[in-house]
Amino acid sequence: MQRRNKDLTDVYLIIAKNIKKYRRKNNMTQLDLAKKSGYSYAYIRRVEGPSCIKNFSIQTIYNLSKVLNVSIKQLFDESDI
């Protein structure tokens, strides 16, 4: 079970890094992403933060992918992060 939790944490970290990467590629600040997505600035900070426990939903990933103009698949991509 412990290994499974680590694997899940790794997936969340990959997604978080990709959200940050694509946000920056779109020349957006965390505040810009918050405003365009409807999430709070604090929530976006938590999503992107490397040290917090991740628990955002597939719906959140979908919504952020639409704002960032990328596919959900791109947010799960481990290469180039």
Regions found by a protein language model. Name each.
Residues 27-47:
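Short alpha-helical DNA-recognition segment
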